[in-house]
From Swiss-Prot:
Glycosylation site list: N138, N181, N252, N337, N388, N396
Name of the gene encoding the protein in the UniProt record: SUB11
Keyword Nucleotide-binding recorded: no
Short name of one Pfam family: Peptidase_S8
Main location: secreted
Organism in which the protein naturally occurs: Arthroderma benhamiae (strain ATCC MYA-4681 / CBS 112371)
UniProt propeptide residues: 20-117
Function: Secreted subtilisin-like serine protease with keratinolytic activity that contributes to pathogenicity.
Protein's name in the database: Subtilisin-like protease 11
Active site location: D159, H191, S346
Length: 400
């Protein structure tokens, strides 16, 4: 196969792709056999990507005709995000070898599973996160916030779907897209509705006047593929561009999985396009440096605290964490006009997304500057934050 331009998925951090690393080195239970994410070099144009995909499609067909190769599906989807180009597909080893040897290809990774970063604990318990992020000191339930409340900002919830008819959204939620084959345009899991309402619900949310867009990229069990997450990201950027709301958009990823460089690059380019991206650190009580999306650049990564301002026992930590936010025992909306309590860094991330949306609406801050401003405003200290981790706690600057 010549020199392989491939990411070794166990590597903690890569500043450049090592062309000698072997695809076969990647080992993980989350890997999808024969399914790949192919990232093009920075110099490749949109037209060149299209031409390359046509070439790959031809190779795949030739393999079936000449070698009797198994039809694994071939090309699936191309990604064009803010000048970044990639595609996904399922290929046999001979076709993959030709892709790896192509001079327009930067690197190839396995497609992998990714999962939500939250879990249900109980129903109908009292909430505390709203009061906590609007006061420097612990112990109050009152939520104090700027009256703009995210007005004019659009929140993209890339998740299990959203019950857009839930009364907590007050008619501000719309369905965007469903990229998960074999599922309906709804939220049968509940995670997506809960996170969206945490960010932008009328009763349970922080940015109470923000618009909400449902983007279903995880199945009804809370699992998904990075190739679908990337497809959803591309759609969000294009939708925001068409609606002329780049610079006034927030995107939340309450998910976690092993580090995938292609996915990180897609997320980073969505942020660079003009979207504030809040992400979950993950729930493994380990350093999030080797996790995606936590390790992506230009995102605001959230770890989770308890009501006592301790690091939640499950929460990941590490240098990629930008802020802690409430994440244990968080009450929010769930499908079919219900409410529920969930815990996880999944709940912490939309707190950051919601406060970020409010900040963008009230101060006109650019998405690229929001995370730094939130860090500057933060309270704390968080107790026992973990090694090499900030002890700063999300605060909305209410003055209380």
């Amino acid at each position: 196969m010549g020199l392989f331009k491939v990411i070794f998925t166990a590597v903690a951090a890569l500043s450049a792709v090592d062309a000698a690393e072997l695809l076969s080195s990647a080992k993980s239970k989350d890997i999808i056999p024969n399914s790949y994410l192919v990232v093009m070099k920075d110099s490749v144009s949109s037209a060149e990507l299209d031409s390359h995909v046509s070439w790959v499609t031809g190779l795949h067909r030739e393999g079936i005709a000449k070698r009797g190769a198994e039809n694994l599906g071939g090309f699936k989807h191309s990604y064009k995000i803010n000048g970044w180009h990639a595609y996904s597909g399922s290929f046999d080893s001979e076709t993959l070898a030709s892709i790896l040897d192509n001079d327009k290809v930067d690197f190839v990774e396995h497609d992998r599973h990714v999962y939500i970063s939250g879990f249900v604990t109980q129903k109908d318990a009292p909430s505390w996160g709203l009061g906590r992020v609007s006061h420097r000191m612990n112990g109050t339930r009152d939520y104090v916030y700027d009256e703009s409340a995210g007005s004019g900002i659009t929140f993209y919830g890339v998740d299990t779907g959203i019950d857009i008819h839930h009364p907590d959204f007050g008619g501000r939620a719309v369905w965007g897209i469903n990229v998960v084959n074999g599922t309906k345009d709804n939220d049968r899991h509940g995670h997506g509705t809960h996170t969206a309402a945490t960010a932008a619900g009328t009763k349970y949310g922080l940015a109470k006047k923000a618009n909400v867009v449902a983007v279903k990229a995880l199945n009804d069990y809370g699992a998904g593929l990075w190739s679908n997450i990337m497809k959803a990201l591309e759609w969000c950027v294009n939708d925001a561009r068409e609606k002329k709301i780049l610079g006034k958009a927030v995107l939340n990823l309450s998910i976690s999985g092993g580090k995938v460089v292609a996915a990180n690059q897609a997320i980073t380019n969505a942020a660079k396009a003009g979207i504030f991206v809040s992400v979950a650190a993950g729930n493994d009580n380990q350093d999030a440096t080797n996790k995606s999306p936590a390790s992506a650049e230009n995102v605001c990564c959230a770890a989770a605290t308890t009501i006592r301002d301790d690091k939640a026992k499950f929460s990941n930590y590490g240098s990629v964490v930008k802020l802690y936010a409430p994440g244990q025992g968080i009450t929010s909306a769930t499908p079919n006009n219900q409410t529920g309590v969930m815990s996880g860094t999944s709940m912490a991330a939309p707190h950051i997304g919601g406060v970020g949306a409010t900040l963008m609406a009230s101060k006109g801050i650019a998405p690229s500057a929001v995370c730094a401003e939130l860090i500057k405003m933060a309270s704390g200290p968080v107790l026992n934050p973990g090694a090499n981790t900030t002890n700063k706690l999300l605060y909305n600057g209410s003055g209380k």
